[in-house]
Amino acid sequence: MSAVLAEHAAAARRGTVPATAIVLLGTGVVGGALLKLLNTGAARSLRLVGAANSRRQQTDPVSLAQRNLREQLNQHGAPRDNASLLAALDASEAAVKVIVDATASAPLAARHAEWLARGYHVVTANKALAGGELSGWRALQAALAGGGRYGDAATVGAGLPVLSTLRRLRTCGDSLLTLEGVFSGSLSWLFNQYDGSRPFSDLLREARQLGYTEPDPRSDLSGEDVARKLLIIARNAGFSLGSDEVQVEGLVPEALRALDLDTFLARCDELDATLAGRHAEAAARGSVLRFLARLNQRGHARVGLAEVPLTHPAARLYGTDNQFALTTTRYNTQPLVIQGPGAGPEVTAQALLGDVLALG
């Protein structure tokens, strides 16, 4: 049994009312990292009252305090039932009740506005609502008008202070003019490494083995995840962009899109010739390739591969770094650049925990 969570279990048995109660949805890579953080001193003011994966859930305090909670869920958890999870939140009588969504589930994200309207706070790494259809974004804003709070730092840059900085600038009367950057840790690593000496497909397989890409790397190569992040930032900056208004140039040719995963991995060397040609053309002009997201003042948004000169900030990235260059009314001579690790379960979980603690 974990020490801090054991204290929570004992407090629950005594009927002590916590300051902040949490239900965690998603106990995968990011959710599992958050569970570890909940067993640190930083989380002593919080109480986990429910946890669920896609099929099973647990609300028993003693079970929630087990170090092997993720395994316990599969073996001893009750069938998934959102109503009973919310009932556990209500029964806690905590002043602050928080639903943490550590999944990538679109159906779950579609519930965020409803939960906010019912008086819960939502903290999320799930981009499907804020970075999805414009109607979902508008429903979210309407729900927030009721007083609920939405912790979304983990949706962009794995918690880099992008959204918080943008909101602070807007509060001070500043306005975003243009945005440019590398928003994907996996694509950052791939093009930071790609110098033409190795086939791109070799690097792609290596990135997958290192855990930098999704199990199906086409999820990264499609550019759709980058587009969702761009939409989230743009909408927070005041641009009413629909998901169909982002021009996305993915890296997966149509012939490889519908293949099963094993066949795609066997044939991903079909990516090599096109990318080698683009690399050679860029190198001849003294440039490198980077997978960029761009937004201009007119609201034109584009995601895709671009050539940048060696003096460009994106040409000097390292590893899986993300980079966000914001040109604003006041930061108009040089952009405000936010850069750092933009992927990883630990930093993403820390962003979730930070948003939860900010509610207390």
Label every model-predicted segment.
Residues S2-L24, G28, L34-L37, R44-G50, ...:
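NAD(P)-dependent dehydrogenase/reductase Rossmann-like domain
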Residues S2-A117:
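N-terminal glycine-/serine-/threonine-rich beta1-alpha1-beta2 phosphate-ribose binding loop
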Residues A95, G146-Y150, D174:
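A short helix-to-beta-strand connector/capping loop
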Residues V98-D101, V122-A125, Y150-A153, T178-G181, ...:
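General beta-strand structural signal in soluble alpha/beta enzymes
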Residues R118-V122, G185:
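Glycine-enriched alpha-helix->loop->beta-strand junction motifs that scaffold or abut catalytic
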Residues H121, A128, R149, T213, ...:
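Residue-level detector of anion-binding/catalytic polar loops
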Residues Q66-R70, L140-A143, R168-R170:
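Short, hinge-like loop/turn segments at secondary-structure boundaries
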Residues A106-A117, K127-A153, L160-L166:
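Rossmann-fold NAD(P)-binding glycine/threonine-rich loop
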